C-alpha cells in the first residue's frame, strides 16, 4: 500500500476540489471528478449499510486513469495518480481478507463425534447364560472283542472344539480363549434373569439356565440313569431367602466352568447406589456453581446398583512421544468440545448492520475508497464471531494447538490479535504462528509508534518478538503489557484428582483488559515519527474502535473464561499440554468480529449439555482404562504361555481398534512398539490375572476334552499290537506313556536334531513324541489293511520333517461296514504307531451339580445423572467466580 507524504491533505474532499479550481484545472474536469467521487461514495455507503454481506468492489472504469490527470503536472494530481495506481492491489487484499472469512474454517466431523458418543458402558448388557467351555455328551461303550454295547457313557467334551494341532498353536488357542473370556466377562450376574423352568420338576421349580435344563432333560430320559438321580432332578428348584435378597439356583457345570462362574459371581463390580453417590458423581464445581440449580427427582430403592467407572489417570502418557495418537485424541476431544460450547446466536450479538454503521461513523469513512481503514470492516459477521468463540474455548478444552491467519495490512486484525494474545496463553499457539503474529504487531504498531527501527527477527531465536521488545521499550504501560503476555501460561491445578489447565486470575476477572487498554492508549498517543500522518491516523482509529468497546471486551473475556472453566469441570482425563501435529486455524478477522459484535447477553452451557459432555468423557475414559487392562493382560499371558512367535504389534493394534477413534493402519510403527513397551510395564488387573491363572491350571483338562488332537505318538520299527479301548474298540491308542522314552515334539522341531530318535529306532526301542498332534480317525477296514504294511515313520526319519507326521487312529470294531472282512479272529491287527490320547473326564452327575448364589433382584443404572433435574438462573444474573455478574456492561 502506498501512502501519501506527510502534510499532504486528502484530495477527494470538496475543499480540495475548490483548490484545484483555483489552481487553473478546467471546470469540466472538476465536475467529472466530483460526480465520480459522489457516485462512488453513494454506492459504497449503500453497500456498507446494506444488510447483505458482500465484497466491496469498485467500478472497473474508475481504475482507468483519466487522460487529463495523466497530462496534469500539478503535485496533487501526481499524488492522486499514485494512489489510484495502487488501489487495485489494495482492493485485492481486501477481497482476499473477506473471502478468507466467508469460507467456514471448521467442518464438523460427525463420524468422530458419533464414535465418541456411541461408547457406552458394557455393563448395560444383561447376561442371559452362564459361561461354559464344556458340555456332556453320550459316547458308546465297546466290549473286549470290539463289539459295541447297547449301553452309553457320558463324558465332558468341548462345546466348541476348535483346538489346532501343534503345541505352539494350542497355546495360542488358549490365549485366544483368554481374550474371548475377557471380552465376555460380565461386570455383574443376576441369575434370576437367566433362570428357566425345570420341566421335570414336581413343583414348578427353576434351574439356573437353559443349558442346565437341557442336560437335565437328556439325563432324565436316559434309560441307564439311576432312579435316585431322576428323583433328585424332580426335586431341583431355586431356594429364595427374601429377607437377605438372595436366591440359590441349581446348575450342572463342569468343575472348571463352575470355577469361572463362581469367580464371576463373587467378584461383581456392582456397588450399592443412593442419592448421595449420585450427587457426589456430579463434578464438584458444577454442584457448587450458583448458576446451576440441581435437584434430585426421587429416592432410590435399596436394590439400586451402579458400576463405578474406571478413571485411572495417565497410565500410558500418550501425550509423551506419541504424536500421532495424541493428535487423534485431541482432535476427537476438540470436535466433542465444539459440540457443547454454547453458540453465540445473532440475537446474542450486536446487529452486524448497526455495528458496521457505527464503526463507519467512528472512522469518518467519507473517503472510503482511498483509506486503509476500508479493511477494518472486512469480514465482520456474526458467523465469524461465533466460530471464533467456539474455536477458542474448544481448543483450550482439548489442548489443541491453534495457528493464526492474518493479513499484515489490516491493522484492525492486528489490534484484535493483541486482545487475543492477552487473553489466551501463549502455549495454545503454534510457535511459528505466534512469532509471525507478534512480529507483525511489533513492526506495524508498537515500534513505529515510538519511532524505533523495524525488528529483524532471527528464525530459531529462543526469545519471541514480544520478549525482545519488552527489554527495548521504555514506556512502562506497554512494557508491562508485554511482560504479562510473555508470562501468560496455564496454571496446572489438580482438582478432584484431574489435572486442569487454569487461566490467570487477571484474565478470569477481565482486569487484564484494562492493562491492554492502557498500553493501547499509550500507543495511540505516540507520534509515529517515521511514518506518514495517514498511517498514524489509521492505527489510532483502529485502537479507538477497540477502546470504545472496553466494557464489552472485559465482559467477553469473563464470558470465555467462565464457559471454559465450567466445561473444564466435566473433563475426567488429565489435561496434558503438548503442541499437536495438526492445528486449528483461527482467522484474526474472526477475532475482530467477536470483539466488535459481542453484546451484553450472557450465554452459559445448559445443564443437559454439561451432563452429556461429562457422560461422554466418563465413558471414553473408562473404556480406555478397561481396554488398557485387557491389552496388558493379553501381553502378560502371551509371555507366560511362551508364545515366542506372537506379534505383539497385533495386540497393540487390537487395543487401539477397541478405543474406536483411531485409524489404526495410519499409526506409525515406532509409536506402536513404544506403546507395546509401555503396556508391558503395567501390572495386570486382579480379576484378569485370576482368570488367566484358572486357564493356566486347567489347560490339560481342556485339551483332553477335545476330539481334534492327541497328546503325542509312540513310534517303533516293530509292529505293536492294537489294544481294546472302551471308547473306541480295537485301536492303536495308548492311554499312558509309562515305560517309553519321551521327547518333546516342539523342541525337536525347533532344534532339528533327529539323531536321537533315529538311534533309538535302530535299536528297536519305541520312542514317545509328546506334543499336540492331529487325532485322525479312519474306521474303514479296507483303507486300514492298505496301510498295515507301511512303516509310518520311516519316511519321516528319512526326510527329517517331524511336522509332517499324521498319526492314524485305526478303528476295528463292529461299527465298520466292512467288518465281515476281518471275521478271521486268528488275525491280530498291528501298527507301527500308537496315538497317545488322554482320557476325557467322565460326567458324574453328583460332582457336576452346583448351587449358585446371587442377589434375588437389583437394578443397574448406567446413566446416574438422569435422576438429577437441573436448571439455570436467568443468564443475565449468572455470576463468575468473583461473585460479580459475568456480563456487567448493560
From Swiss-Prot:
The record marks 232, 236, 849, 851 as: Interaction with the intermediate capsid protein VP6. Residues 9-26 have a biased composition (Basic and acidic residues). Residues 28-42 have a biased composition (Polar residues). Residues 1-88 are annotated as: 5-fold hub. Sumoylated with SUMO1 and SUMO2. Sumoylation of viral proteins seems to have a positive role on viral replication. InterPro entries: Rotavirus_VP2. The N-terminus binds RNA. It is necessary for encapsidation of VP1 and VP3. The N-termini of 10 VP2 molecules form a cylindrical hub underneath each 5-fold axis of the inner capsid. Inner capsid protein that self-assembles to form an icosahedral capsid with a T=2 symmetry, which consists of 120 copies of VP2, with channels at each of its five-fold vertices. This capsid constitutes the innermost concentric layer of the viral mature particle. It encapsidates the polymerase VP1, the capping enzyme VP3 and the genomic dsRNA, thereby defining the core. Homodecamer; each decamer is made up of two conformers of VP2, called VP2A and VP2B. Interacts with a VP1-VP3 complex. Interacts with the intermediate capsid protein VP6. Interacts with NSP5. Interacts (via N-terminus) with NSP2. Belongs to the rotavirus VP2 family. This is Inner capsid protein VP2.
Amino acid at each position: 500500500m502506498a501512502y501519501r507524504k506527510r502534510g499532504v491533505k486528502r484530495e477527494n474532499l470538496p475543499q480540495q476540489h475548490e483548490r484545484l479550481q483555483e489552481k487553473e484545472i478546467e471546470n469540466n474536469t472538476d465536475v467529472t471528478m466530483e460526480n465520480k467521487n459522489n457516485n462512488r461514495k453513494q454506492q459504497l455507503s449503500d453497500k456498507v449499510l446494506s444488510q447483505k454481506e458482500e465484497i466491496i468492489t469498485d467500478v472497473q472504469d474508475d481504475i482507468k486513469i483519466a487522460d487529463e490527470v495523466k497530462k496534469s503536472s500539478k503535485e496533487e494530481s501526481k499524488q492522486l495518480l499514485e494512489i489510484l495506481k495502487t488501489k487495485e492491489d489494495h482492493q485485492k487484499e481486501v477481497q482476499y481478507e473477506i473471502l478468507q472469512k466467508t469460507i467456514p474454517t471448521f467442518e464438523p466431523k460427525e463420524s468422530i463425534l458419533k464414535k465418541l458418543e456411541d461408547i457406552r458402558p458394557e455393563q448395560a448388557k444383561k447376561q442371559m447364560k452362564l459361561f461354559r467351555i464344556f458340555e456332556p455328551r453320550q459316547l458308546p461303550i465297546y466290549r473286549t472283542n470290539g463289539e459295541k454295547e447297547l449301553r452309553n457313557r457320558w463324558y465332558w467334551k468341548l462345546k466348541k472344539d476348535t483346538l489346532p494341532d501343534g503345541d505352539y498353536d494350542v497355546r495360542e488357542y488358549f490365549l485366544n480363549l483368554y481374550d474371548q473370556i475377557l471380552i465376555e466377562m460380565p461386570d455383574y450376574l443376576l441369575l434370576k434373569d437367566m433362570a428357566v423352568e425345570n420341566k421335570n420338576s414336581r413343583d414348578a421349580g427353576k434351574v439356573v439356565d437353559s443349558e442346565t435344563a437341557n442336560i437335565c432333560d437328556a439325563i432324565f430320559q436316559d434309560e441307564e440313569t439311576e432312579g435316585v438321580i431322576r428323583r433328585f432332578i424332580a426335586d431341583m428348584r431355586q431356594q429364595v431367602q427374601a429377607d437377605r435378597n438372595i436366591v440359590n439356583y441349581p446348575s450342572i457345570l463342569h468343575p472348571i466352568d463352575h470355577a469361572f462362574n463362581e469367580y464371576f459371581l463373587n467378584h461383581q463390580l456392582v456397588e450399592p447406589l443412593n442419592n448421595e453417590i449420585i450427587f457426589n458423581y456430579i463434578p464438584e464445581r458444577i454442584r457448587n456453581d450458583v448458576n446451576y440449580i440441581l435437584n434430585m427427582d426421587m429416592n432410590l430403592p435399596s436394590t439400586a446398583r451402579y458400576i463405578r467407572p474406571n478413571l485411572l489417570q495417565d497410565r500410558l502418557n500418550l501425550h509423551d512421544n506419541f504424536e500421532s495418537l495424541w493428535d487423534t485424541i485431541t482432535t476427537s476431544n476438540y470436535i466433542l468440545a465444539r459440540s457443547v460450547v454454547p453458540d453465540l446466536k445473532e440475537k446474542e450479538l450486536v446487529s452486524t448492520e448497526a455495528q458496521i454503521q457505527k464503526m463507519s461513523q467512528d472512522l469518518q469513512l467519507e473517503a472510503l475508497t482511498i483509506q486503509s481503514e476500508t479493511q477494518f470492516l472486512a469480514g465482520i459477521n456474526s458467523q465469524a464471531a461465533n466460530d471464533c468463540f467456539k474455536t477458542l474455548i474448544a481448543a483450550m478444552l482439548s489442548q489443541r494447538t491453534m495457528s493464526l491467519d492474518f493479513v499484515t495490512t489490516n491493522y484492525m486484525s492486528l489490534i484484535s490479535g493483541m486482545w487475543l494474545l492477552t487473553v489466551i496463553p501463549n502455549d495454545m499457539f503454534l510457535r511459528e504462528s505466534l512469532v509471525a503474529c507478534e512480529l507483525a504487531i511489533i513492526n506495524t504498531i508498537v515500534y513505529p509508534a515510538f519511532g524505533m527501527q523495524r525488528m529483524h527477527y532471527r528464525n530459531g531465536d529462543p526469545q519471541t518478538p514480544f520478549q525482545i521488545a519488552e527489554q527495548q521499550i521504555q514506556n512502562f504501560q506497554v512494557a508491562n503489557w508485554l511482560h504479562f503476555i510473555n508470562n501468560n501460561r496455564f496454571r496446572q491445578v489438580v482438582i478432584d484428582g484431574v489435572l486442569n489447565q487454569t487461566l490467570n486470575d487477571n484474565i478470569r476477572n477481565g482486569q487484564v483488559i484494562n492493562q491492554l487498554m492502557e498500553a493501547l492508549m499509550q500507543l495511540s498517543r505516540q507520534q509515529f515519527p517515521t511514518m506518514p500522518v495517514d498511517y498514524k491516523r489509521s492505527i489510532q482509529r483502529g485502537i479507538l474502535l477497540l477502546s470504545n468497546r472496553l466494557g464489552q471486551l472485559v465482559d467477553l473475556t469473563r464470558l470465555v473464561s467462565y464457559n471454559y472453566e465450567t466445561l473444564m469441570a466435566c473433563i475426567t482425563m488429565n489435561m496434558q499440554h503438548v503442541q499437536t501435529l495438526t492445528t486449528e486455524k483461527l482467522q484474526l478477522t474472526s477475532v475482530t468480529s467477536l470483539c466488535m459484535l459481542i453484546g451484553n447477553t450472557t450465554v452459559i452451557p445448559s445443564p443437559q449439555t454439561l451432563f452429556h459432555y461429562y457422560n461422554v468423557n466418563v465413558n471414553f475414559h473408562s473404556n480406555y482404562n478397561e481396554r488398557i487392562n485387557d491389552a496388558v493382560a493379553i501381553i502378560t499371558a502371551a509371555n507366560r504361555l511362551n508364545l515366542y512367535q506372537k506379534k505383539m504389534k497385533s495386540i497393540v493394534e487390537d487395543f487401539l481398534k477397541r478405543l474406536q477413534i483411531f485409524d489404526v493402519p495410519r499409526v506409525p510403527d515406532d509409536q506402536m512398539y513404544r506403546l507395546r513397551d509401555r503396556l508391558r510395564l503395567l501390572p495386570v488387573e486382579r480379576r484378569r490375572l485370576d482368570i488367566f491363572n484358572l486357564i493356566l491350571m486347567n489347560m490339560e483338562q481342556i485339551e483332553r476334552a477335545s476330539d481334534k488332537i492327541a497328546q503325542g505318538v509312540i513310534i517303533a520299527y516293530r509292529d505293536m499290537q492294537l489294544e481294546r479301548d472302551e471308547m473306541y474298540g480295537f485301536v492303536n491308542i495308548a492311554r499312558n506313556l509309562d515305560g517309553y522314552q519321551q521327547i518333546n515334539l516342539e523342541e525337536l522341531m525347533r532344534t532339528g536334531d533327529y539323531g536321537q530318535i533315529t538311534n533309538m529306532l535302530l535299536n528297536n526301542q519305541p520312542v514317545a513324541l509328546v506334543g499336540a498332534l492331529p487325532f485322525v480317525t479312519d474306521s474303514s477296514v479296507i483303507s486300514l489293511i492298505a496301510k498295515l504294511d507301511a512303516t509310518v515313520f520311516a519316511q519321516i526319519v528319512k526326510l527329517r520333517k517331524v511336522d509332517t507326521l499324521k498319526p492314524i487312529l485305526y478303528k476295528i470294531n463292529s461299527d465298520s461296514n466292512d467288518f465281515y472282512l476281518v471275521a478271521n479272529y486268528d488275525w491280530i491287527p498291528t501298527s507301527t504307531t500308537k496315538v497317545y490320547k488322554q482320557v476325557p473326564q467322565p460326567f458324574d452327575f453328583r460332582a457336576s451339580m452346583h448351587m449358585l448364589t446371587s442377589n434375588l433382584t437389583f437394578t443397574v443404572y448406567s446413566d446416574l445423572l438422569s435422576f438429577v433435574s437441573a436448571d439455570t438462573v436467568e443468564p443475565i444474573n449468572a455470576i463468575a467466580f468473583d461473585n460479580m455478574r459475568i456480563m456487567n456492561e448493560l
